[in-house]
Amino acid sequence: MARGPTLRASPILVLGGFLIGAEAYGPLVASLERLSGGPVVLMPVSRLDWLLTLFPFGWARLLDRVAPLAAELAARSPSGRITMVGHSSGGILLRLFLADGPFEGRRYSGRCLADTLVMLGSPHTALKATAMRARVARELPGAFFASAESDPVRYVAVAGAIDLAEEAGQASATARRLAPTAYRNSTGDPADRGDGLVPVESALLEGAEAVVLEGVAHGGAFGPVWYGTPAVVERWWAAVASPAGGAASGAA
């Protein structure tokens, strides 16, 4: 992407979730553009790209593409830094992108480029976490750079909570089928509260600002209302746009 003129509002870079196509994020991107007044760029990721993240080199392969895009947007930002939004696994990947330490022979130091990281339904903790998620939790615990002396990052963790009962109309058949096992693997409680895939407890990150949204599912496959639904984007973006430091909750 060629460098353009300096923008009036800080740009936003969005990294979606595991195996979720770009078309799912169209309403989210459009809503953020309207609400923020700045450009919003969705990182292009193929199904193959996501499948390769089962291995460390697959994470590096994706972050190698995030880095130049983030740098170009930051160069045009009035503040010199951008907001990053990660949905599901995308939020975990972006936590790693912020780090200064070596990863697969690279150093990303993304915190020099991003001053805010918003994580939507990201599975930060789990009893049965994948090796890479466990590594991020171990090496970069909590809101790791929130209190850094230089280039601190504001972390905002957004969690959804749906009623799995069919009559509630919040959860799809897929969510009702998968949630008990997914919750058990994360917190040990199959009846936990969550977005149909990720329990609230797992989606909230120690040290991050917390936003819990009732009636919000993990994705379109898990319920009719999810983090990318325009009305829901308005709710979590209001928390991001407000002064840092507060927690929020509410119905979708």
Which role fits each region the language model picked out?
Residues 2-252:
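Lipid deacylating catalytic domains
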